[in-house]
């Protein structure tokens, strides 16, 4: 096995206290435990192929948490940490572990209705000025991640901006996130 692409996830948004516990459990099961199970299943095969790679889809939500997406963000932070830890653990076996951290990608998931709104997520994002990246950008980033040396590969302008702000001016992100949250309430 040359590459296993661990790409599964679902998001159930809304205020933390309003999201049913079974939705939290489902996100944990799919977004984090699913990635763990995929890694467990793949390791015996990846370790037999020098230069192989486990590629996990993380998310830009694994860069900085967002109100209304608390458990989703927590699962993506978990994938980020798992990726970093396994990259260290599996290196002696010749296995690289990488992640993709996409922001908003032009897929049908954006056509779903935003939490607490009658508009699609796509409409909400466009109105807020967020970039929606084409799926081809993800394919290019996946190849770059598999062949490259970086543990995490950001996908899309929004992910790059978020990573920059989180590193250099995290207080600004927090203020903007709180303003956005206040506007929703």
Question: Can you describe what each PLM-predicted range is?
Answer:
Residues 15-16, 23-28:
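Substrate-binding pocket helix/loop in short-chain dehydrogenase/reductase
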Residues 59:
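Residue(s) in the substrate-gating loop at a strand-loop-helix junction
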Residues 92-157:
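SDR active-site lid
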Residues 64, 85-96:
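Active-site-adjacent segment of SDR/Rossmann-fold oxidoreductases
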Residues 7-12:
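Conserved NAD(P)H cofactor-binding loop of Rossmann-fold oxidoreductase domains
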Residues 17, 66-70:
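Active-site loop immediately N-terminal to the catalytic Tyr-X3-Lys motif
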Residues 39, 75:
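Active-site helix of classical SDR
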């Amino acid at each position: 096995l040359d590459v296993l692409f661990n790409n599964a996830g679902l998001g159930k948004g809304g205020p933390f206290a309003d999201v049913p516990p079974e939705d939290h459990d489902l996100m944990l099961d799919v977004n984090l435990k699913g990635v763990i199970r995929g890694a467990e299943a793949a390791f015996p095969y990846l370790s037999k192929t020098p230069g192989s790679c486990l590629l996990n889809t993380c998310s830009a939500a694994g860069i900085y948490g967002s109100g209304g997406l608390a458990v989703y963000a927590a699962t993506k932070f978990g994938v980020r940490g798992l990726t970093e830890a396994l990259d260290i653990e599996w290196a002696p076996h010749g296995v690289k572990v990488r992640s993709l951290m996409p922001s908003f990608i032009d897929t049908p998931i954006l056509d779903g209705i935003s939490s607490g709104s009658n508009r699609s997520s796509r409409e909400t994002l466009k109105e807020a000025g967020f970039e929606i990246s084409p799926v081809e950008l993800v394919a290019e980033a996946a190849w770059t991640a598999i062949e490259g040396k970086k543990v995490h590969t950001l996908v899309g302008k929004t992910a790059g901006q978020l990573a920059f702000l989180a590193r250099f001016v995290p207080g600004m992100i927090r203020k903007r996130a709180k303003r956005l949250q206040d506007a929703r309430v």
